[in-house]
Amino acid sequence: MGAGQSICFPPISGPHHIGCTDVMEGHSLEGSLFRLFYPCEASETCEQPLWIPRYEYCVGLADYLQYNKRWVGLLFNVGIGSCRLPVSWNGPFKTKESGYPLIILSHGLGGFRVSYSAFCMELASRGFVVAAIEHRDQSAAATYFCKQTSQESSPTESLEEEWIPFRRIKEGEKEFHVRNPQVHQRAKECVRVLQILQDASAGKPVINVFPGGLDLMTLKGSIDMSRVAVMGHSFGGATAILALTQEAQFRCAIALDAWMFPLEHDFYPKARGPVFFINVEKFQTVESVNLMKKICAQHEQSRIVTVLGAVHRSQTDFAFVTGNMIGKLFSSGTRGTLDPYEGQEVMVRAMLAFLQKHLDLKEDYDQWNSFIEGIGPSLIQGAPHYLSSL
């Protein structure tokens, strides 16, 4: 993997083989880009996709972390640019008459559509279809869309990439005035992807800008649109909470270490539930926990748990990057005292129990119902005591 760097994803525990494809819908900023993880048919020969799709994302990641874009972007590309996901790229979709439940996933600040592949793969192996969005509000480390430059050429010949850089807060700017419009755009993008997949499940044609990908018509009748959840990490956690309120088709939300700051105070009386807040030990503040408690007070099925020994980036794929050089570039914020593989297992089990309960799934995930109450390995209910004062 170049310079001894690699990423070692947690082993998959579900019964399904996993397929993966990228979908870009539309030729403008208002379109959508997401990576779809899904149960697929077994295949003797399958291509495994790159974890980091392109070099531009390595450069964007370096820029987001405020390193030299040229040199550190190159280092990231050498260190992790050749790592691949253990899934079948554009693998044949495994149809299901009763349909799979759907999860829309929103990334955090500086993330992009592959930043939570470990969670996505595990959930897909358990029989979920997961759409990991790449937001176009300038909160992604890098993203792009393909615009048509000529009406006379064929659609693929006339496409030109337009890259959208990460938006940093400028001197003198109020951060809330930047982040609040972003979180609202992000929620709309979640709803847009939901609509695209609803069309695909209904057998309506969805044109994917990327050539040679999965035929989305194969999804027809195989997504259960009555069992849909929205999920996100950090900025994506706030996005999931807002999207749940704005779109009734979302039945519940999972907020991983949610960054509550971008949500306006007027939002809270309107907030819907249930929301499952899965926090880590060292990120939240008393103020943010109190905002979570406001939502929980309005919706008795909402819960807050904390994963002890975990840090903010423990909930991203970067927790599984090995090698000292790349690890140091991500700083001590990449790993906590809790083994990242143990943390992943605990969080996934808590998610599955919550999803079974609120999507009415007929699985055995209720064996982990105690995790929803903060009773389980490395879990506590609510927040650590030093954040618990109202």
UniProtKB/Swiss-Prot annotation:
Question: GO molecular function terms here?
Answer: 1-alkyl-2-acetylglycerophosphocholine esterase activity; platelet-activating factor acetyltransferase activity
Superkingdom of origin: Eukaryota
What name does this protein carry? Platelet-activating factor acetylhydrolase 2, cytoplasmic
Reactions performed catalytically: a 1-O-alkyl-2-acetyl-sn-glycero-3-phosphocholine + H2O = a 1-O-alkyl-sn-glycero-3-phosphocholine + acetate + H(+); a 1-O-alkyl-2-acyl-sn-glycero-3-phosphocholine + H2O = a 1-O-alkyl-sn-glycero-3-phosphocholine + a fatty acid + H(+); 1-O-hexadecyl-2-acetyl-sn-glycero-3-phosphocholine + H2O = 1-O-hexadecyl-sn-glycero-3-phosphocholine + acetate + H(+); 1-O-hexadecyl-2-acetyl-sn-glycero-3-phosphocholine + a 1-O-(1Z-alkenyl)-sn-glycero-3-phosphoethanolamine = 1-O-(1Z-alkenyl)-2-acetyl-sn-glycero-3-phosphoethanolamine + 1-O-hexadecyl-sn-glycero-3-phosphocholine
PROSITE patterns recorded: LIPASE_SER (PS00120)
How this chain sits in the membrane, per its record, is: Lipid-anchor
Which organism was this protein described from?
A: Rattus norvegicus (Rat)
Q: Which Pfam families match?
A: PAF-AH_p_II (PF03403)
Gene name of the encoded protein? Pafah2
Oligomer status and interactors: Monomer.
The protein's UniProt keywords, in alphabetical order, are: Cytoplasm, Endoplasmic reticulum, Hydrolase, Lipid degradation, Lipid metabolism, Lipoprotein, Membrane, Microsome, Mitochondrion, Myristate, Transferase
Tissue specificity statement from the Swiss-Prot or TrEMBL entry: Expressed in kidney.
Q: Does the keyword 4Fe-4S apply?
A: no
Query: Which compartments does it reside in?
Result: Microsome membrane; Mitochondrion membrane; Cytoplasm; Endoplasmic reticulum membrane
Q: Name one GO cellular component term.
A: mitochondrial membrane
